Regions:
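Conserved C-terminal helix/tail region of periplasmic/extracytoplasmic solute-binding proteins
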Residues: 100-133
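Helix N-cap / beta->alpha transition motif
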Residues: 6, 23, 83, 122-128
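Secondary-structure end/capping motifs
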Residues: 28-112
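A bilobed periplasmic-binding-protein/Venus flytrap-type ligand-binding module shared by bacterial periplasmic
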Residues: 15-32
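Bilobed "Venus flytrap"/periplasmic-binding protein-like clamshell domains
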Residues: 12-13, 17, 101
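Short secondary-structure boundary/hinge segments and terminal tails
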Residues: 12-14, 77-80, 124-127
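Ligand-binding "clamshell"
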Residues: 1-8
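Generic, ordered loop/turn and secondary-structure boundary motif
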Residues: 12, 27-28, 88, 114, ...
Length: 133
């Protein structure tokens, strides 16, 4: 494989992020369940950030035995990880909604879709902001 580009060259102005999605009816009726999910994710995420070598070894041993640990470590190092507190700050200061809007704009422009929902409308950080103290 040949590396064509390194996305870190565009950070922090742009980022490729993952996330969670829920239907509106599920979100409205299951806020406590979603808050528990957020708190559980935050605990696991913060553990991985603070103990990455141990966490990668555990992931490889317990879930990805067919994948060499060196490959898992390489994949881990290729991403930028943030603590749950860092995410809270970036949710609060609109960093994340701006990154999401960039992704939305890219996909909509390349799909030639003219009418789409802005990120500030479909992204609701309120549960996360309440769950992470």
């Amino acid at each position: 494989a040949v590396k064509l580009a390194d996305a870190s060259a565009y950070y922090p102005q742009a980022a490729i992020i993952g996330g969670w999605a829920a239907r509106n009816d599920y979100y409205d009726g299951n806020r406590e369940t979603l808050s528990k999910l957020i708190r559980g994710w935050a605990e696991a995420n913060d553990y991985i950030v603070a103990n990455s070598a141990e966490a990668m070894e555990s992931l490889q041993k317990n879930h990805y035995g067919q994948t060499p640990l060196s490959d898992i470590n390489e994949q881990f190092k290729a991403q930028k990880m943030f603590t749950s507190k860092d995410w809270k700050r970036m949710y609060s200061d609109d960093t994340v909604v701006n990154w999401l809007q960039q992704s939305t704009d890219f996909f909509m422009a390349n799909a030639n879709i003219k009418d789409f929902t802005p990120a500030k409308t479909y992204f609701d950080p309120s549960l996360y902001l309440k769950a992470i103290v």
